[in-house]
UniProtKB/Swiss-Prot annotation:
It comes from Rickettsia peacockii (strain Rustic). Coiled coil: none annotated. Belongs to the universal ribosomal protein uS5 family. SUPFAM superfamilies: dsRNA-binding domain-like (SSF54768), Ribosomal protein S5 domain 2-like (SSF54211). Keywords: Ribonucleoprotein, Ribosomal protein, RNA-binding, rRNA-binding. GO terms for biological process: translation. This is Small ribosomal subunit protein uS5. PROSITE patterns: RIBOSOMAL_S5, S5_DSRBD.
Amino acid sequence: MSKVKKNDEILSEVLVDVNRVTKVVKGGRSFAFSAYVVVGDKAGRVGAGHGKAKEVNEARGKAKQAAKKRMMKVPLYQNRTIHHDVVGKSGAAKVILRRAKAGTGVIAGGSMRAIFDSLGVHDIVAKSIGSTNVYAMISATFDALNKLASPKSIAMRRDKKVNEISVKSADIQVNE
């Protein structure tokens, strides 16, 4: 895992997948590399990107730039877990994300673990169902993260106060 500093922002980068791809041309085969990278600030922002080039380092650089462009903010509960359970789908891949008590840790498979580590989540239980393709699982995980909402945002949508939408929400300190 490497750190990238840009605009006073430290981002962690995780290389999730590297493939050698082949293009058959008139004169034979042309080889290139494909890379998939997850980038995050460990404080609630994460992004994923894909890049292709003739060299691995170039593909990784392109993937990193694509990931930075696609970064998104995710509301976290106490800066350690998600606010509520959520399901995400992408093609044949399906992921279930469940919030967890403090001290549980990150219980998730490979590519999902990279996302949660870059996001800054410390306690979560994640289960993948169906396809285990890296691209599909990351896409499904981002679909689930897009569906997350903090109690504050739900209250604003309903034109209510935070303590009116849930019995337990009066105890929640909103960190957005």
